[in-house]
Amino acid sequence: MSTNGESPAPEGAGDSRDPSGFLSEIIGAPVTVKLNSGIVYKGDLQSVDGYMNIALERCKEVAEGRVIRNWGDAFVRGNNVTYISADNA
């Protein structure tokens, strides 16, 4: 039981940081973006807004660990995004 009046995070819940705070911390960092269609993009996160619209630089489309296509700069509409993951640099 939490002593500060807050409910403890469920076991296995992971990091409980605010997603918008996390995203602002990783601007300029390498990320992986997975779309609802299953397509995966890797690139440097340049911006993200409240609708999860994402701008990437040095964007590459990746499948099965291989680069399929280099896109350069790319914009991804937020309603297509399944997740954004920070990559280890």
From Swiss-Prot:
A GO CC term attached to the entry: U6 snRNP
Source domain of life: Eukaryota
Sm domain residues: 18-89
Chain residue ranges for the region called Disordered: 1-21
Positions in coiled-coil regions: none
UniProt cross-references to SUPFAM superfamilies, sorted A to Z: Sm-like ribonucleoproteins
Example of a GO MF term: RNA binding
Xref: InterPro entries: Lsm6/sSmF (IPR016487), LSM_dom_sf (IPR010920), Sm (IPR047575), Sm_dom_euk/arc (IPR001163)
GO biological process entries: maturation of SSU-rRNA; mRNA splicing, via spliceosome; tRNA processing
UniProtKB keywords: Cytoplasm, mRNA processing, mRNA splicing, Nucleus, Ribonucleoprotein, RNA-binding, rRNA processing, Spliceosome, tRNA processing
Keyword presence, tRNA processing: yes
Subcellular location: Cytoplasm; Nucleus
Quaternary state and interactors: Component of the heptameric LSM1-LSM7 complex, which consists of LSM1, LSM2, LSM3, LSM4, LSM5, LSM6 and LSM7. Component of the heptameric LSM2-LSM8 complex, which consists of LSM2, LSM3, LSM4, LSM5, LSM6, LSM7 and LSM8. The LSm subunits form a seven-membered ring structure with a doughnut shape.
Summary of the function given for this chain in its UniProt record: Component of LSm protein complexes, which are involved in RNA processing and may function in a chaperone-like manner, facilitating the efficient association of RNA processing factors with their substrates. Component of the cytoplasmic LSM1-LSM7 complex, which is thought to be involved in mRNA degradation by activating the decapping step in the 5'-to-3' mRNA decay pathway. Component of the nuclear LSM2-LSM8 complex, which is involved in splicing of nuclear mRNAs.
Family to which this protein belongs: Belongs to the snRNP Sm proteins family. SmF/LSm6 subfamily.
Protein name from the UniProt record: U6 snRNA-associated Sm-like protein LSm6
Species this chain originates from: Phaeosphaeria nodorum (strain SN15 / ATCC MYA-4574 / FGSC 10173) (Glume blotch fungus)
Gene: LSM6
